[in-house]
Amino acid sequence: MSSLGSPVRAYDFLLKFLLVGDSDVGKGEILASLQDGAAESPYGHPAGIDHKTTTILLDGRRVKLQLWDTSGQGRFCTIFRSYSRGAQGVVLVYDIANRWSFDGINRWIKEIDEHAPGVPKILVGNRLHLAFKRQVPTEQAQAYAERLGVTFFEVSPLCNFNITESFTELARIVLLRHGMDRLWRPSKVLSLQELCCRAVVSCTPGHLVDKLPLPVALRSHLKSFSMASGLNTRMMHGRSYSLTANSSHKRNSFRKVRTIRPPQSPPRNCARNSCKIS
């Protein structure tokens, strides 16, 4: 719980992606198709730079993306050198109806390798809704992506197809590469059965679970879940309990066992510095 007055972040991770490609391949269309956030040219940024933020959900975590479009400017080298600082991913965009834009990807890759070597990349074929004008076969683009060792998508901003999926996959690649996925591995998503067991056990004493109007198998599962939860809680508080058989009541019962702890202070007859470890 955050302290009073401290802002609550609306995301768990913040990533910066660059969209690169020739002019008129539809990078602005991709940004405009994203729902939250508005495409903008922020004050103080050079003309030809469009910026947009959006938040995606990745394995139960909120990932905020800062998306920058260089708009294929001829002075890309200078722009990329400035805006590649801190960029964690690059989206290579071409138009499937424009062969020249696909052939130009090699030039962009050389610039990226020079100014941001090793940054994760994906290849995106834009304007899938213009498939009837296709000039770049899907198989050829897929083979090219495999040679580069990058993931390949064909997207359509008009149909809102594969837009979020492509950004989500790039975010996953970036987080895996930096090992940030380990931060949320312990917080698994609970199953519906475990949630129901927790709800029942939290409001029902353990000795009353047998009296619930439930099937025998379910009562047995709830009882074992209650015993495990109670044992873990008591062990955390420094107590130990053992399960023993009580012949008079013909049922299992808990018996408290005192835990012998090592002395926390030296004996009274032990002088300071008189005990040495050889």
Swiss-Prot record:
Residues 248-259 have a biased composition (Basic residues). It catalyses: GTP + H2O = GDP + phosphate + H(+). Keywords: Cell membrane, Cell projection, Cytoplasm, GTP-binding, Hydrolase, Lipoprotein, Magnesium, Membrane, Metal-binding, Nucleotide-binding, Palmitate, Prenylation, Ubl conjugation pathway. Residues 245-278 are annotated as: Disordered. Residues 72-88 are annotated as: Switch-II. The keyword Transmembrane does not apply. A lipid is attached at C270 (S-palmitoyl cysteine). Its cofactor is Mg(2+). Pathway: Protein modification; protein ubiquitination. GTP binds at S23, G26, K27, G72, N126, R127. It is a lipid-anchor. One of its GO terms (molecular function) is GTPase activity. A lipid is attached at C275 (S-geranylgeranyl cysteine). Residues 41-49 are annotated as: Switch-I. Mg(2+) binds at D69. InterPro entries: P-loop_NTPase, Small_GTP-bd, Small_GTPase, Small_GTPase_Rab, SOCS_box, SOCS_box-like_dom_sf. It comes from the Eukaryota. One of its GO terms (biological process) is intracellular signal transduction. Transmembrane segments: none annotated. Its EC number is 3.6.5.2. RAB40B small GTPase acts as substrate-recognition components of the ECS(RAB40B) E3 ubiquitin ligase complex which mediates the ubiquitination of target proteins. The Rab40 subfamily belongs to the Rab family that are key regulators of intracellular membrane trafficking, from the formation of transport vesicles to their fusion with membranes. Rabs cycle between an inactive GDP-bound form and an active GTP-bound form that is able to recruit to membranes different sets of downstream effectors directly responsible for vesicle formation, movement, tethering and fusion. Belongs to the small GTPase superfamily. Rab family. NCBIfam families: small_GTP. Component of the cullin-5-RING E3 ubiquitin-protein ligase complex (ECS(RAB40B) complex) composed of CUL5, Elongin BC (ELOB and ELOC), RNF7/RBX2 and RAB40B; RAB40B interaction with ECS complex is GTP-independent. Binds (GTP-bound) LIMA1; interaction promotes LIMA1 subcellular localization in lamellipodia during cell migration. Interacts (GTP-bound) with TKS5/SH3PXD2A (via PX domain); interaction promotes invadopodia-mediated extracellular matrix degradation. This is Ras-related protein Rab-40B. The lineage of its organism: Eukaryota, Metazoa, Chordata, Craniata, Vertebrata.
